[in-house]
């Protein structure tokens, strides 16, 4: 992309706003080097990065990066085996800690809902190389201010402890001078430092009272800074300890530097990745500041900007417009008077196209589409004074000439006031010739002009559309609204009349205007009036649609509340029934136990008992039980509904009260429903089968149930003799658990100590259900899978109480 268009369209002003959000030198460098590109894949990749960062910024407050220093010089010094200072190591430590933080941040998001929505950045984060041991070692040794901690080494802590003790001894000795009888010999009763040694400010005439060493004197010579003889030895010891401290500090710094040296390449790569994350963070926060959104990219250069405004204008003050180019026409000619907003409109198209091709979000209120232009040219500049008009015209023409040789069918050309600055007749003719030349090269064009001759250009040229800016004659002010398909209307006479010119002047001016011009202006006025009428009708329809949608939502909410209340009533009734059945079942079990004892006392063996007779009533009671836990199971409910509904079913859509036919099921829990001539997607919860469909399915289910009953009757007769094995293979989950419940009753009454339940392996769902059932059943003392040679985990052995 040529640099001139970036300057003309003020691209750098957009880039400079990124700097407000950057915190790393690498991120700042990447922002400074940002340029629009024409590689579609790269543009989409950049936009995907920005989209990820926008989502993270909205849900997580952004990627948690600290303000980092430039550690490139430090890495170079490490590569030549130099030792870093404590401050430099502190800056390295901050980079290492940020690396660990960012890597952990993205790992945690992968386990959250946001992780499924991120497309690009998590993969980049996987390239970060964390050095946890080294990071921890440096963090322990050096604090955030760049000072070596006492914990950096045992020897350093030992030396510093001795320094602290010696300093305290010196201070105690010196305080004896400042508080005792000798205080009268001091200029001030304080202890100060000269040449790294503790001294007293002694009056010159009392020098002999202290002995020791004079290290300095005041400017007047009346005060001498004396190190008393009594503390000379302590100060000497203190100096020696400080030398030891410096030596140990240097040793620690060399050791830490040597630890980092083998990892300079990984750290440099981390710096690049962190800087890039800083850059995409800035793009996301710029999008938030501008209230911008992600554009779609069209490789055929069909541009469709919906409610777009210039990003350098205040959104609350700017007028948003729809701007479309490339779909049916490749040129837009905006005609009309100056100060109506023509220039800002074409600049908006240009700057948003540059932003999108740089991976930045664009300032539109609705989803919009941009093209991918290999080159964008712009000739924009206000008309100058009469004295400068020749030079202005010449510079514009020179600029256009330089474009012509580089224009092709992948180029967007922007002209502002084409042909201005010279004789109007020649300027209009030249403008038409230039537009024809650019069109012959296949370029996409948007141009502004106030020449009336170009109003007919859009009607006489293929793939060309007229446009204008709306002017409110009643207020004599431009509205800055962009109107496509209608050329600019001349409002000079209307404005003159409103400003007070008499009918004689207006009439004379009208008479001097050609009939063609009057007809054209009248045609434009009629088109504008029709557009306004259609727009008002559209607004009315939109308001009516919103009211209808609001009413529909209210009815849907009312329906949901009714369904919730109905479900609660049914559930309460079922729970009450369960309590009654449980009490009755307990009585029945007690009666069965008493009958069994009576028969045993009468001399009958357990094997002679008619278990079918004893269990008949109990099974009837079991059948009455309403399994509230299964009713509450949303997964089972969804599975049941999915099995109950099928394509071709006649159904009723509850929210509309309309009958229809199911066409096909979609993966998002919705069905495609045909209602008369309409086809629409409806939530599965909103669908109820019609009575005819339900009866047909009940008939099929009844026939199937009769087959199952016959099978179970034969199986039940076999189990009546209380066999020690129950085979549940091929039985549906719920039916299998009910059958297991009945079998355990039979086995307990038959005094069976151990039973075998065969459930097979399959998906493991039935095996897990049997295991859960046995775990919570009081009749089961213990259970385990069968031996490997006896079925393994395809069968469970249960020991009964």
UniProtKB/Swiss-Prot annotation:
Binding positions for ATP per the UniProt entry: 336-343
UniProt xrefs under InterPro entries: DNA_mismatch_repair_MutS_C, DNA_mismatch_repair_MutS_core, DNA_mismatch_repair_MutS_sf, MSSS, MutS, MutS2, P-loop_NTPase, Smr_dom
Any GO BP annotation: mismatch repair
Keyword Cell membrane: no
Residue ranges constituting the Smr domain according to the UniProt record: 726-801
Top EC category: hydrolase
Region entry Disordered, spans: 696-721
This protein's name: Endonuclease MutS2
Gene that produces this protein: mutS2
